[in-house]
């Protein structure tokens, strides 16, 4: 598996392996265990900005990814900052406990807006692909500022995301889930266990969240989606609600925990 273990710092569209990809990539395995830092924009643990077709690839991030972007084109993700391309038959994982040469690495994502455990902003078509986030996501908001679109998997989504079964249809081969903890310190909006902001035409199916969300100063906080604009134009169907507990305490007035949903968010 090819990979990056060095620290990478730049202004915007900073990637641990690739900054800008406009070409098709097929049959590649890659990882990042280094620190990827964008000082005035978005970052991706592996790819900062992708417009190409990705097929049959495995990408794993176990490094620290930090972005500072707040505009609509700046996305920060554990694997990809901003994805506009199609992704098929692949695995994208932001993980913890990743071992290389007896050394253990943990993926962490920090940012301001359009932050996702796997992808910051997605406008592409993703199918028969695993999107898995096991790492923590932390957003620290300065006073008088507002963070928006924070998701366990995707910060802002206008594309389609679909898992899938194996050829025998006996089990879900491609997993879509988040079990990392999302923490937003300060004012925020559109905070979701899977997607922060699912815009019109955005969809996700066959996914679930088990991660806790701590966002006491935020609005539009959901176990699956923080803000679903596709609902107003189309509909939202929950296939299976396993458990949802909303805890309100004086210390943490808006904390979602112990959430495990299998849901379909669709725009048809």
Residue ranges of predicted features:
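Surface-exposed loop/turn motifs in large extracellular/passenger domains
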Residues: 1-268
